[in-house]
A protein has these predicted regions:
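Secretory targeting and sorting signals
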Residues: 1-30
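Extracellular carbohydrate-recognition regions
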Residues: 31-66
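Extracellular glycan-recognition surfaces and repeat-rich motifs
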Residues: 55-94
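Secreted extracellular polysaccharide-interacting domains
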Residues: 85-112, 163-169
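Glycan-recognition/cleft segments
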Residues: 129-157
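Short, aromatic/His-centered strand-loop micro-motif at the edge of beta-sheets
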Residues: 159-181
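Short tryptophan-centered beta-strand motifs in secreted/extracellular beta-sheet-rich domains
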Residues: 177-188, 197
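Flexible glycan-contacting loops in extracellular carbohydrate-active proteins
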Residues: 207-237
Length: 245
């Protein structure tokens, strides 16, 4: 364990996110997607909350937050299958933010998050490009990301004392300009929280004794909630599932 400091044509449907600046984006041109593409599925347990290949051409169903030069759109520039994917673009400019979130039903005890990610532009050294971030209310308590300084995959946990605990998940760099699958299982129970992480189909982390500040989970976020988290990231075949026991 280690501590470190941390468009092709596009269309977006932006929904207000409580607690942050949000702007409604009105598309000038609709992208050409393939709405007949099969809805993504996986073998993880739970009830499907979100299963999206972004072939609708919109981010409908997500809470979208953008600010400054940040954009959250659907793009035809990159796609794992079909013709479209979600695209988050954030710069180093002041106030640049882009993310979208999946709200979880009341009573959620466990959540599985699964998706494909392609980072084409990394951010500034010392910062990161997020994959999945898990929130309890407004508090982010678990996330995984690609660390810009060396490209490694890291897990970050907010402890009850208010400090972050970091775990390196891969020794090698996560390659840019390539699709990678990230899946996570999170069951928030304070000092007995379960966190599991899979990278490209291989489990790289599993513990039922993770010490977190959270005892509930209310949403899963893609992208960063704070500004200047520079990076270009495409997301496809996103699946979020919940369990109530």
């Amino acid at each position: 364990m280690k501590r470190i400091r941390m468009m092709g044509a596009a269309v977006a449907l932006a929904l207000p996110l409580i607690g942050g600046p949000a702007f409604l984006a009105v598309p000038a041109n609709a992208v050409t997607c393939l709405p007949g593409t099969a809805t993504p599925t996986d073998s993880y347990p739970g009830t499907v909350v979100m299963a999206n290949n972004f072939e609708s051409g919109t981010l409908a169903g997500f809470a979208v937050q953008t600010g400054g030069t940040g954009t959250a759109t659907v793009s035809t520039a990159q796609h794992r299958d079909g013709a479209c994917s979600a695209y988050l673009h954030v710069t180093s400019d002041s106030g640049s933010i882009a993310n979208f979130s999946t709200a979880l039903p009341s009573g959620t005890k466990q959540v599985y998050a699964d998706g494909w990610f392609k980072i084409t532009v990394a951010g500034l050294s010392g910062n990161d490009v997020p994959y999945f971030r898990f929130f309890s209310g407004s508090t982010r308590f678990v996330d995984v990301y690609r660390y810009n300084s060396n490209g490694q995959l890291w897990l970050r946990v907010l402890t009850p004392g208010g400090t972050f605990a970091y775990t390196r998940l891969t020794a090698s760099s996560v390659s840019l300009n390539a699709w990678h699958r990230i899946a996570m299982h999170v069951t928030p129970k304070g000092s007995a929280t379960t966190v599991q992480v899979w990278f490209d189909g291989t489990q790289v982390y599993s513990s039922s004794q993770v010490n977190t500040v959270a005892t509930s989970v209310t949403r899963v976020q893609n992208g960063s909630e704070h500004p200047q988290q520079m990076g270009d990231e495409y997301i496809d075949d996103l699946i979020i599932k919940n369990l109530t026991s």
